Amino acid sequence: MEMKVPNGLTLNDEWTPRNLMLQAFPEAVLPDHLQEDELPLSPVYKFVSRAMKLDRLLEVWIPHGANIVLTGENWSVMLKEYENDSWLTVGKTSKSSKTQESENFVCKSNHVRFKTDHLSTFKLIGKIDTSKSTFVFKRMKVVAFCSETRVGEDLVVRVYCFDDCEWSFERMMRTEQKTGGRLMSPIESVSFSVTSGKDVDISVKNLAGWQMKKASPLKFSYESLRNSFNVIPRCDLVFQNCRKTLSTSIFVEMVLNHEPSGETTIYASASLKKRILGDPLVRALDPEKVEE
């Protein structure tokens, strides 16, 4: 029997301990001295229960962000446990196989499985092969949001590039819910190369009736994407109306160039809130200058 618990984990067992709680937080909260060829593949997961030790093994599934399907031979996925103020490796895949199974550690295309008889703190780390001129990809997603905007105001588009796991998605959604964010685009996939050393540039196209006023920045930096489990990379684009007739909606095409895997295109749109009679801007405008 599978039981989904918050933050994307799955407990796969007919038996689960009572009063089980789960805390998930960025890797930076309990920092690890990662090597140059290592990067986080999950947040830190801490299991909390009244019972410190279990009376039987519990199977746990943790999602990871490595693109095993495309570049599994260049990834080594490690399961680490926090003990005595330090991180210890308790499970590891082989670089010679896309999936590595052992008695207590299994790595699949988008998650690992392991069994534990105690409740502790775990995370996943990816180690990449830098001895060859090869590309190693991480699975990510990109999406655009905006807040409620009135006709005649500048529109701020927030573009996120987040890890392809439930925890990152929920974390981003909580941020947007606090500011009344509105979804502008479908969620698209991005294969980010963790070995290219290149930023992911964003270009904006087909801005009918609008122009980009500023961007901070107009890219996702390489370092921010490598460490996206700590801070979700975000780009804020500000658009202003450039028509004599004010637009009541916006459509924008954004292209992410992520060499060497190619490009990802986002089509984002939103309707602007109409102003009511008595609004200072309405009084200042000729009614014919606002789109119906």
Segments from the language model and where they lie:
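Proteolytic cleavage junctions
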Residues: M1-E292
